[in-house]
Amino acid sequence: MEKRERKKIRVLAGGVFDLLHVGHIHFLSQAKSLGDELVVIVAHDETVRMQKRREPVNPAEDRAELLRALKMVDEVYIGSPGTIDYELVRKINPDIVAIGPDQRFSCERLKEELRKHGINSEVIRIPYLYKEDRAKTSKIIQRIVETYCE
């Protein structure tokens, strides 16, 4: 009997990933555990300026290169300026979209928006690594400033 090849489950994760830290690693490893391939979309610098109201510490190209160096990450793209790049998401064709604990939209709302754009993916939220928010880029920047800039 011929062995049928199982379809690989493709997971998509997106984020800023500035000052890569343990919270990012936890998020990406949990996202990877949901499937076989992990594709990451890194936020465009203009998107960071709009959403975070600050300059990214590292440009998108550098953040993408760091992510490409991680064993758990299979592909990396830089998103378009602004909101979700549905054309890119459609091209990636994920089975699952993993969202981080700090991403503001709900799983159901994102699932609806994806469907409106012809993308039939499950949406799963990955929880925080720690109960407190110490593994956040903004908190790390705050600790650096408090410790080294006085």
From Swiss-Prot:
Kindly give the InterPro entries that the UniProt entry links to this protein.
Archaeal_FAD_synthase, Cyt_trans-like, FAD_synth_RibL, Rossmann-like_a/b/a_fold
Q: In which pathway does it act?
A: Cofactor biosynthesis; FAD biosynthesis; FAD from FMN: step 1/1
Q: Which residues hold ATP?
A: 16-17, 21-24, 102
Residues annotated as coiled-coil are none
Molecular functions (GO terms): ATP binding; FMN adenylyltransferase activity
Which cofactor does this sequence's record say it needs?
a divalent metal cation
Report the record's Gene Ontology biological process terms.
FAD biosynthetic process; FMN metabolic process
Q: Which HAMAP family match?
A: FAD_synth_arch
Recorded hits in PANTHER family, A to Z, give: FAD SYNTHASE
Functional note: Catalyzes the transfer of the AMP portion of ATP to flavin mononucleotide (FMN) to produce flavin adenine dinucleotide (FAD) coenzyme.
Q: How does it assemble?
A: Homodimer.
What's the name of the protein?
FAD synthase
Origin species, per record, is Thermococcus onnurineus (strain NA1)
